Amino acid sequence: MADGEDIQPLVCDNGTGMVKAGFAGDDAPRAVFPSIVGRPRHTGVMVGMGQKDAYVGDEAQSKRGILTLKYPIEHGIVSNWDDMEKIWHHTFYNELRVAPEEHPVLLTEAPLNPKANREKMTQIMFETFNTPAMYVAIQAVLSLYASGRTTGIVLDSGDGVSHTVPIYEGYALPHAILRLDLAGRDLTDHLMKILTERGYSFTTTAEREIVRDVKEKLSYIALDFEQEMETSKTSSSVEKSYELPDGQVITIGAERFRCPEVLFQPSMIGMEAAGIHETTYNSIMKCDVDIRKDLYGKIVLSGGSTMFPGIADRMSKEITALAPSSMKIKVVAPPERKYSVWIGGSILASLSTFQQMWIAKAEYDESGPSIVHRKCF
C-alpha cells in the first residue's frame, strides 16, 4: 500500500438520473452513466446470449426493448437497495475497474436523507464491498466547496429533485433546507407535452431521450417571460431547428423558453409550489437574520437543471425583487456546475485535513452502522 496511487479514494455521486463516479483528485468524473437497472421481461428469451439477470446504465438503456427498467433512486433518495447495490457493483468493477476493498469511498446523499438510509449505505459499503473506509457527504455542501466557499446557499437541481440548502461555515442548516419535487424529468415531460400539442408525437422512452436532448441543446430561460412570449409571436428570432434521428427536421420556437419556465412557475404544470427563486428566498428567511446577508451574497447554482442559459440573470432579478432593497444579491453559476457535486467530493476526499474524517472499517466493526451519524454531518 506504500504506493499512493493504490489508495486513491473513490468518489461516487448517485443522482436520480445519472451516476457520476471517479477518483479523488481528478477534475472530472471518469464515469457518467444513467442510474438504471434493467431486468429481462421474459427469462430464457435470449437463449445462448449468456443472458445476465440484470443490466446497468448504458447497457440497460440500449437493451430496453427486452428489459423492465427501474430507477433505484427516486427524488434523490435511494428506494431500492438491491438495485442500488447492482449500480455500485457496476460502478466499481465495470466502470472504474477497481477493487473497492482497496480504496476509501466517498458517497453523496440528498439533503434530509433519512437516517436509516445513511446507515444502510454505510452497511453495504463495509459489509458487501469491504471498503477500508468510507464517508457520506451532503450533495449541496460539496457543490459549495467546489465553488471555493464554505458559506452560502446552494440551489441544487438535478433530474429528480431540487433543494435549497443554506450552509454556514461548512455545515448545512437542516431547519432551513427546502425540497422541491420539480426537476429535469418534469421539464422533459412538459416539453414532450408542448411538442405533442404542436402535433409531434413523442411518447416512448426512446422518444423521451430525444426530447431530453432537445431540452438540453435548445432551451433557455427568458429574463422576462411575458415579453419573450410577445416577441416569439411576432418574430422568428427565437426559432431553431432540430434534426430528429430519422432525418425529420422540427422547428421549435417559444417551447425553448416555455419548457424551463416551469422552474419559476410550477403552476404551469399544475404544481402547487413556489418556484426556485421563491424557494431560495424562503430558505434564506428560515435562517438567522445575522447570516442572511452572507447567503444573499453567495447563491450558488448546481446540478444539470441549472444549466439553462439565462438562469443566473433571471434568479438574480427575481430574488432582488423579493429581498430587502439594500441587500446585495450575487448569483454564482460555475461553468462546471453540472458536475460540481462530484468535483466537491473529489476536492474534499483529497484534502490532507480530511484524512481523519473517514469512517474506518475498525470503527464500523466496533460501533455498527450508526457510526455514520457521529462522523458524517
Curated annotation (Swiss-Prot):
What InterPro entries does the annotation carry?
Actin (IPR004000), Actin/actin-like_CS (IPR020902), Actin_CS (IPR004001), ATPase_NBD (IPR043129)
Keyword ATP-binding found: yes
The UniProt GO MF terms for this protein read: ATP binding; hydrolase activity
Where it sits in the cell: the answer is: Cytoplasm, Cytoskeleton
**Any single Pfam family the record assigns to this protein:** Actin
**Gene Ontology CC, one term:** actin cytoskeleton
Source taxon at top rank: Eukaryota
Alphabetically list the UniProt keywords: ATP-binding, Cytoplasm, Cytoskeleton, Hydrolase, Nucleotide-binding
Catalyses which reaction(s): ATP + H2O = ADP + phosphate + H(+)
Instruction: State its Enzyme Commission number(s).
Output: 3.6.4.-
Q: Keyword Zinc, does the record have it?
A: no
Share any extra remarks: There are at least 7 different actin genes in tobacco.
| Sequence similarity | Belongs to the actin family.
This molecule's function is given as: Actins are highly conserved proteins that are involved in various types of cell motility and are ubiquitously expressed in all eukaryotic cells. Essential component of cell cytoskeleton; plays an important role in cytoplasmic streaming, cell shape determination, cell division, organelle movement and extension growth.
Q: What is this protein called?
A: Actin
High-level lineage: Eukaryota, Viridiplantae, Streptophyta, Embryophyta, Tracheophyta
